Amino acid sequence: MRFDVVTLFPDFFTSPLASGLLGKALAKQIAEVYLLNPRDFTTDKHHRVDDESYGGGVGMVLKPEPIFAAVESLPVLPRREVILMSPQGERLDQALLQSLADNFDQLVVICGHYEGVDERVVDHLVTREISLGDFVLTCGEIPALTLLNGVIRLLPGTVGKAESLQNESFIDGLLDFPHYTRPADFRGWPVPQVLRSGHHAEVDRWRRTQQIQRTRDRRPDLYQRWLNSLPPDSLQDFTV
C-alpha cells in the first residue's frame, strides 16, 4: 500500500517510520511511505506556503498552489483517497482504519497547519477529511502519523500473528479484556485463577465478560452502540 504525506515537517516522520512494526512493514515493502514538502513546490524565491486570511483575522492559512502542485505530482493508483487531517473531519475509529486498509491502494495525507488550508483544497482536491477528535493540535503531522500507524498495522504481514488483530479493543465494538503475565503473584495481587486453569472455554467466557463489563463501565457510549448492534433475542446472553 502506498502512502504519500504532504507535510511541512518531513523530519517529524523519520524516527517513527524507522522503528517497530512500521519500520518492519516498510522494510518488507508491505507499505511505502513518501514525504512531500509543499515548500519544494513553490515558485517564489522565499518558498512561501502560507498567507493572510481573506476577510481578516488572526493566523495564517496554507496556500492552495503548493498543495495542489505536490499532490498533482504524484502517480494516481486506481483506488486512491486524498485525506486532509482536520478537526472538521469524520472521527477516526477502528472501523474507519479497517475500511481504509481494505479499500484503498494509495492514501495521500495532507497535514494541516496554522488556521488550516485554503478551502479550495478541501473543495477541489481532498476526497475525505479525518479528525482524531474534538480537540486542536499544533500540527497535522501527529494525526497523520496516527493514521499511518493504524492503517499499516492492519495490512497483511505487518503483525506477526493475524489472530492478534482479532482480539483487540474495538474490533467487535468492545474494549479489550485485561491481560496478565508472570509472575502469577505480584505484591499480593494474583492473576485471576481462571486464567491459570487451562480451561479454554472458561478463559474465553471470563474474557468476554470482562470486555462487556469494562466497556459498560469505561465507555458507556461504546457499550450502548454495541448493545444496539445486537439482535434483540440475544441481549439476555450478554447481561453481566
Curated annotation (Swiss-Prot):
S-adenosyl-L-methionine binds at residues 112, 132-137. Its EC number is 2.1.1.228. It is found in: Cytoplasm. Keywords: Cytoplasm, Methyltransferase, S-adenosyl-L-methionine, Transferase, tRNA processing. SUPFAM superfamilies: alpha/beta knot. CDD domains: TrmD-like. Pfam families: tRNA_m1G_MT (PF01746). GO terms for cellular component: cytosol. Specifically methylates guanosine-37 in various tRNAs. Homodimer. This is tRNA (guanine-N(1)-)-methyltransferase. It comes from Cyanothece sp. (strain PCC 7425 / ATCC 29141).
